[in-house]
């Protein structure tokens, strides 16, 4: 599926991009939770349009003239606004859309999801990872990301479920049903968002569509893709492929294989690993001894270690700078970058420019709603996505799974264990892949159009930690070309 194109075009892109020098910010910062939805009034104009004129007016209304602090020389268009996902309209998801730098009628549409569940794709995906801008240390100004994925595609980021980021419900405590219905209702709302967004942007109907993301998007993406295929006889969406980085696909299998990564990177001793394997084994669980050894393996609680990239520094000072830091290189890590994004998106002039927070929500924008995560039912978190992946591949949907090789949250050892359970035949053996002469990682192809790749030196957020390799990986996938096998 997808058209073959000459890799030399991509090689030229990466050669020119490699000359760019920008600041690179990296880490995973947690924010307190909030409860969303109480006492809000919804604007029902965001829901179904009744005429082409209304569709056009809604689209024009969403056009972002210019983001505050945006650098000069930006030619691509940006949009932001709300799309209702139920009828009567009470649940509204916020989106941020950036057109491709060099758009054409064949340029694909790509949806991006972050995980959580309960984390913002606008905050993380658009402004920290693969969007066209990143936020300076002053929390007010932006700088270009030369490796933005809108070099190759039209990029659509939206925040869901309701109560995440700027998304909300006008029905009090509506968010509570997401704790009960969780994955199912989220998938339904995500589907209705896409259908209604395409009504507002009808020029993208019939385009090749790809769905990408990371982490708990390992649930969001397969479930949305499944609904799209099941309902394509009603509303056709030209889904060509899905790609998921460091994905949560089968929590139980992943949990059994995380400690191999922890041991191999020197985070625990061989003695402790052997003791853990002995007393915490599911079949021979020791109720007295396992709780004693368990804390040594709960590295996510170590405030001195970034579990999302074990080699990245942690943020020690959350204070914004009065002036932007001087430019360094895009590969340099700023562990406090999430604080800059939070300050930027909570600015009133930014919200006004992005057509966000139009109802004046009674809480500030946060990167993650941890309360929503806490009430998400365990049965959904534990559910395996492997059967859905098999169904999607059976319908001809191409699948790319990739892992940053220094992520301890969902390490490559866990993902490879899940892929092993799929019992797929390897068609192209394990081999290195390259970007601009540098080793990008390793890859393997399976039957039925599934590719797995590791990304050297990256943590949980591959487009953040290794933006050049990430763009190479993404471009190869949507062009349906092999990853370069030679330097």
Swiss-Prot record:
Give the signal peptide as a residue range, or say none if absent: 1-20
SS bond list:
119-368, 280-290, 315-336
Q: Which residues are glycosylated?
A: 233, 317, 357, 423, 449
According to the UniProt entry, what is the EC number of this protein?
Answer: 3.4.16.-
Tissue-specificity statement: Expressed in seedlings, roots, leaves, flowers and siliques.
Q: Which InterPro entries match?
A: AB_hydrolase_fold, Peptidase_S10, Ser_caboxypep_his_AS
Q: What is its main location?
A: secreted
What are its GO biological-process terms? proteolysis
Enzyme class of the recorded protein, top EC level: hydrolase
Task: Please give one Pfam family short name.
Answer: Peptidase_S10
Q: What does this protein do?
A: Probable carboxypeptidase.
Stated name of the protein:
Serine carboxypeptidase-like 38
Tell me the name of the encoding gene.
Answer: SCPL38
